[in-house]
Amino acid sequence: MNTPETFVYDMCHGLAKAHPELEFVEKFKIVKKVDINDDKVSLISGGGSGHEPAHAGFVGKGMLDAAVCGDVFASPSQVQVYNAIKKCATDKGVLLIIKNYSGDCMNFNNAMSDAQEDGIKVDAVYVNDDIAVKDSLYTVGRRGVAGTVLVHKCAGAAAEQGKELEEVKAVANKVIDNVRSFGFAFTSCTVPAAGHPTFEIGDDEMEFGVGIHGEPGRFREKIDYSKGTFCDDLSARIVKDLEEDLKLQKGEEVVLLINGFGGSPLQELYILNNSVTKVLDADGIKIHRTIVGNYMTSIDMAGASITVLRVDDELKKLIDYPVATPALTWGAAMGAQAEAAVEAMNAIAKALNITPGAAPAAAKKAKKASADEDDANAVYEVEGKPVIGETINTAAFVQIVEKMADVIIENEVPFCEADKMGDGDFGMSIAKGFKQLKADWATRKKGDIGQFLVSCSEIIKEYCGGASGPIWGSAFKYAGKAMLGKKEVSLTDIAFLFTEANRGVFETGKKSFGKGADIGDKTLVDALKPCAIALTKAAEEGKKLREGLDLGAKAAHEGAEATKSHVATLGRAGTVGERSIGYPDAGAHGLDVIFNELAKYIKNFK
């Protein structure tokens, strides 16, 4: 690669250049068909990058119309998803296919709400095929993994046949109800920005129930090659679990997907397929179609997942329906892929009113004109000199937020390392947003403290990766609205600011999952809410500003430390359950570091 920062951009540009029927909308990291058919339902999926070919590799005839690409292992922002919906909206509507992860659900749901308010017909389904996560303790529920590819395939075929939005959604949900997956790994994976594996595992060990973001699995055990039947024994164990969970009966038919995680050679995947097929045959389960290869990967992880989809006559026809995408092609659609490329180039030429040969130059001009318009942003200066006494004025508050951004950026790698029980991207996800905030500093409105915070929330919401975007963006937005019109804040105001920030986080979770995070759920709220409570108490007791802030920072630290003994119930760390005990929550730890650094900064401010 060139750099971790350009990893996704370079990859998507390369994909589009190899497949001229596709285009890459760089500003919003969207890979889409050049020609959107207004006579069919558009399908949009996406998520964090690092799972290629999912999801951009499945954009094409018979599957997706667009894929929204987040940073590696971080969901795309709601702004990205919203723009994908706008670009792909048709008279028949749009269906979002969402993998069941906190960040994906938050950002896709928020984008869907925005699009619906604009009058766009859009609906969604949620894929949760991973049986490794089965305990009712986990409020987010099972993860969406390789079974998502089969949802794309069947829903895509239904859309291609001209079915209505409600019918396409019903097909997608039918697949979701009948598909199950289970994964295992021999190594972890390495996120480009981190440069080291997300978890450690011995050469003689394997991880059962591993996630596609480098999350540790359900349990770990030693590999035993001594009998010479390792793959057969492994397959029998996993297939039994899949059959039981799906309640498969003798004589039923399935589609079998043997999916590599990116680091296992194709030979091993076919060996695994041989073993799995023998087990299914012995159990009287008929295989309608087998798919073997890398479809939903985890960068360079050595390992695989086994997916079974129970099929009836309807699903068999949809699975067999012709498809032409970069990563999946069969049937009459083989020729359609070249056909689609020609159609795409003609569509570009028609839209720009030029000959096909001149399209690239004209497209560059159009893109430059659009970029010039985007650059026409106003610049805002803050009035007066920064002052901190028993109140903090706007100029000083702006400096404090800038210091906060510096702390986050400086701790990008340590914050990633703290995210061992999640997917290891917390530091990268939040630092990305605050780097952008610093880059756009001059364009943030600074008329008063509330206006400034709300203005910051727009950048944070769009550029912080994964769940961090909606969570931190909401915290800033709610805090900002509470401070609108204030040009200076006291300890009492700051306590209310933190209380409202916590409410923003709670309401965001409630909107997406029906339950907002509270103390004990092992999230950043374990640090944020105690801090808000301590600040409120200090203000009520008449404490001085700096003393009150110290007490708030101390409460945040104690809350973050307490998460070591908690079982994670929300977010990606929630999927590992009791294995999260002994590790602090990454978000709570991050707030602990940030609040304590800011308390020191304010104490020493002159």
Which sequence ranges carry the predicted segments?
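N-terminal loops that bind phosphate or other acidic moieties
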Residues: 1-606
